[in-house]
């Protein structure tokens, strides 16, 4: 239910199941939509004037407690106000891509520490400004078991990389960075012509190209078909494949 309470504080105790809580502070013009994974036994407290909705991941049982009077004929007057925070399309995108476990060690001990609101896919250019587009939460979680940082959502590769427009080599500063990195790695790791360097998510081969110039064998793995084609054309052997 997309709604907010102008006066009352809402408390939700999840007895069983799990859901994704989405909130937005309506009194702060700079606030963004934030998500939070709620698991059984946890209590969510929603202050007044915070828009709120839930996306359930499984059948769940919860106790919904709101301070103050609550008459059924009072809905939308002073007690509970409608506010469309999440539409059907956004809800489906989140259900499809939200990660409840660490993608490295499968731990459920994920702690969010960066929340930047909803964002369209990178370089997802529209033909017309009126065209609709997909949005996803842009948030970073920290796994307290393996210490890996990762996005809270994993957009399906086909949707993300069907026609990827970003090319790393368009930036001279980025090129220089990887040239210096290649030199440093060659010295510190004693890389030779017998070595093999594999770059997963290699884009157009910006990191591997200076290694090849040193005579070091290199292989790129790139999920975007159009970008992998460019890398191969530029002499950087690249396999078009998604690694997840």
Where are these regions (language model features)?
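N-terminal juxtadomain amphipathic helix
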Residues: 95-173
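Conserved SAM-binding loop of SAM-dependent methyltransferases across substrates and taxa
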Residues: 204-215
